Structures are given as C-alpha cells and as structure tokens.
Swiss-Prot record:
Disulfide bonds: none annotated. PANTHER family: NUDIX HYDROLASE, NUDIX HYDROLASE DOMAIN-CONTAINING PROTEIN. It is a multi-pass membrane protein. The chain crosses the membrane at residues 123-143, 227-247, 303-323. The lineage of its organism: Eukaryota, Fungi, Dikarya, Ascomycota, Taphrinomycotina. It is found in: Membrane. Gene3D superfamilies: Nucleoside Triphosphate Pyrophosphohydrolase (3.90.79.10). InterPro entries: CoAse, NUDIX_hydrolase-like_dom_sf, NUDIX_hydrolase_dom. One of its GO terms (cellular component) is endoplasmic reticulum. Keywords: Membrane, Transmembrane, Transmembrane helix. This is Uncharacterized protein C14C4.10c. One of its GO terms (molecular function) is coenzyme A diphosphatase activity.
Length: 329
C-alpha cells in the first residue's frame, strides 16, 4: 500500500476546517504547536508561499523531549512545544505562541510563520477516561525554513526536526507496554497496584519508533531509555494525517486499539469488542479519533477484567476439585 503525504492539499483542507469545540470542558486548558518547516528555504516574499511549496520539498516537524522531572506526569516524553494556559493569555493560540517562544525560542508571530488551522479540541483524562485533567488545543503552523532553536532546559531536554513522512513508515509502527495499574486512582495503596499489575499485566499501546539525530541529546541516552512517540502527541499526529495522508488514515496504519499482554484477557477482550472494532473499520477516521475510540473501548476493558477475574476463579476452583478428587482416589 502506497502511503501518500499530500502536504498542499492537506494544509488547504485544514485551513478550511472548523474544529469542534468541547462542551463542558474542564477549566484547566493547554495548547501545543505543530510546527512544520523545510530544510530548503521557501520563497516567503510571496504572501501565498504556502500554496507554492514545491512537491520535492521535504516537510519536517519539530518534536521535543520533555525534561526529566519527578513531578511531571509526562516526564521525558516526546511532545510538541506547548503548555498550560496562564491567566495573562487572552486565547489558546496565544498560549501556543508564548510556550513555543519560551521552550524552543521560536517566535511564531515572526519568523514568517503561517498559521494553517486548528485540530479538534481533546479532553485529556486519566484512569481509563474516568477523570478529566485538562482541555488541549492543537494549532498547526508552517514555516518557510528551520529557525535556530534555543531550548529552555528546565522544560525541554532535547529537540529535533523530524521528517513528517517518516512517522508513517510501517517499520516504525510498534507497540509499547504500559502498566495497567495506571487505571487505578493515585490514592490506592501501592500493594493494591502491585497486585493489580501482577494479575492484569501490561496494556500494549500503539507507538512510533523514532530515529534520533546523533547531534540530539536524546541520542546520547541508552537505547532502552530513548522514548517513543506515543500517547497524546501520537493522537495529535493521527488527527493531522487525516488531512495530510488520507490513505494511512483510512486504514488506521499509524494507530490501533490497545490490547492486554496476558492472552486470556486478550481473547476475552477480542470477543467482547469484535463488533465495536468492526464499526470502527467501517467509518472514516474523524477529528479526535484516538480519544473517541478509547472512550468507547474502555468500558469493554473493564468488562474484560470482571469476566477474566471470574474465569480465573473458576479455573482455580476446577483445579481444586481435580486435586481433591485425585487425593481421595
């Protein structure tokens, strides 16, 4: 299957798109900037230069690795420039401007940056969608060249311009293990979380394996510590490729639903979700696709845990009966 990245058409569609606003959103808000640029400087003397980008020009996107902090929920993760909206910010896009300037030193109000459009808002949740944390807005910008970066070390460990099309390569699509006990509240005792993890195992989530530039600080990390593109940032690119790469979006090539590490739970979940998965495959992905799919999927995971627990109890009881009958005979 040929994966096409139609940048010009995608940017045009995105510029005409009216992003959906989330009703009853949590009060805490944050914004990120998806910044696309080119190694070969474009002719920005023409005000309509984004419509005249040569087909041979290779688009890059700016990715950052967050600094390592114990207090940060997303410590060390791959991300996009951005952060929480402050009281002085008059709008969500102003938050993206301010945070980008602070974190990587790019002034999006200068640098000949062109604002393309916004993706759908998404509510970031925890505990398998139970608790809303914040509302995230994503804004897409395109620059005619790659400006120099000035990293805020307290927030950003490293940054790299990454080929946008490489995020679609089949060999870069992978799965990573995420501790299933993260579905529990933080107030639960540690031994409860440990028992839950032993019983349930990990959840296998979609992710993208990245190739880091040798000049990047991330490259200096041991291979097992180098991060994947996953989670929230991954979901933003899934939405972006709905516009830029319809072929990959149609077949959900860069994201799919998570599954359990343990085979018995995986089988039970597959049984309960077979019609749900079929419905998803019959519709074309739309805005906020990852979180929409997960919000409908998490109830099936909870049902799987209940049925799986009862099934395992039944097996233990059956084993007990067999052993008892053996010793009696």
């Amino acid at each position: 299957m040929e994966l096409e990245l139609d940048l010009l058409t995608g940017l045009q569609l995105l510029s005409e798109y009216c992003p959906r606003v989330t009703p009853n959103a949590p009060p805490r808000r944050a914004s990120v900037a998806v910044i696309i640029a080119f190694k070969e400087s474009q002719d920005f003397s023409n005000p309509k230069w984004p419509q005249c980008i040569p087909i041979t020009s290779v688009p890059y996107v700016l990715l950052i690795q967050r600094s390592f902090r114990d207090t940060d929920r997303w410590s060390g993760h791959m991300a996009l420039p951005g952060g929480t909206r402050s009281l002085t910010d008059k709008s969500d896009i102003q938050t993206a401007h301010r945070e980008t300037l602070e974190e990587v030193g790019i002034d999006l109000r200068k640098e000949h940056a062109h604002f393309v459009g916004a993706l759908d808002e998404r509510v970031i949740t925890s505990n398998w969608g139970q608790f809303p944390l914040l509302l995230l807005s994503s804004f897409v910008f395109i620059l005619p060249y790659m400006p120099s970066l000035r990293l805020q070390e307290s927030e950003v460990f490293s940054a790299q311009w990454y080929p946008l099309a490489d995020l679609l390569l089949p060999e870069c699509q992978t799965r990573i293990q995420i501790d299933s006990s993260r579905a529990l509240k933080k107030t639960y005792p540690r031994f409860i979380k440990t028992l839950f993890h032993l019983a349930v195992g990990n959840l296998m989530y979609s992710a993208i394996r990245l190739e880091f530039d040798p000049s990047s600080a991330t490259y200096s990390l041991p291979p097992y510590q180098r991060p994947f593109l996953r989670g929230i940032t991954h979901s933003i690119f899934v939405d972006l490729f709905i516009f830029l790469s319809p072929s990959s979006a149609r077949h959900c090539l860069c994201w799919s639903l998570p599954y359990f590490q343990h085979y018995d739970l995986r089988f039970i979940a597959s049984f309960f979700t077979q019609f749900y998965r079929l419905r998803l495959h019959q519709v074309y992905p739309r805005g906020n696709w990852v979180f929409t799919c997960l919000n409908g999927y998490y109830p099936y995971l909870k049902l799987t845990l209940l049925v799986g627990f009862l099934f395992r109890l039944f097996l233990v009881y059956l084993l007990f009966l067999i052993i008892s009958a053996y010793y009696k005979s």
